[in-house]
Amino acid sequence: MPVLRKIIIYALGKRREYFMDIKTPFRYDHVGSFLRPEYLKQARAEFFDGKITRDELTAVENKAITELVKKQKELGYHAITDGEFRRGSWHLDFMWAFDGVSHSATDRGLPFHDEAAILDDTYLTGKVGMTGVHPFVEHFKFLKQFEDENTVVKQTIPAPAQFLAQFAMPFGWKDASEFYATREELAKDIAEGYKKVIKDL
């Protein structure tokens, strides 16, 4: 049954309101991120240590995702995801695939549940864009094979506002300001990149 939803977006000091007629095939949903099985975490560690190839890691990821999809269906989920099993970070992996975005290892950790989450430093090395095909598109195609009459595939991506915040906040703007005169210009390029990714999906 169609549901009319009012969406309010605040960005860069401006408020925008949208009304969307959304037809949802179910009444509940889940975020889409699941705990990684130990064998997948082990394979990822071996990949970063140079002990296995990218293709070997992908094969392990495919196995873990296939098992996860089966479990989601058994539990009666109507929206299925890959659990974000191909990612090291729920948001940064998506950003790193954009033109102009680079990252490097860091020893500094960010506090997360009384632990230090070691995430790569992420910064701009040029204008943000998406001239190629984002890797998440292939991830989505792999998952699509599992759709059936009771399930639909959901691709999770960070919100554009999360992407913008990564570089518009003071710690990120230092690098970003070398390529953008204003945050509004950065936001526009991010939006164009997202449009390309979503179109390809």
Residues of each region from the PLM?
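Short, Lys/Arg-enriched N-terminal segments with co-localized hydrophobic residues
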Residues: 6-19
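Domain-level signal for soluble alpha/beta catalytic cores
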Residues: 16-200
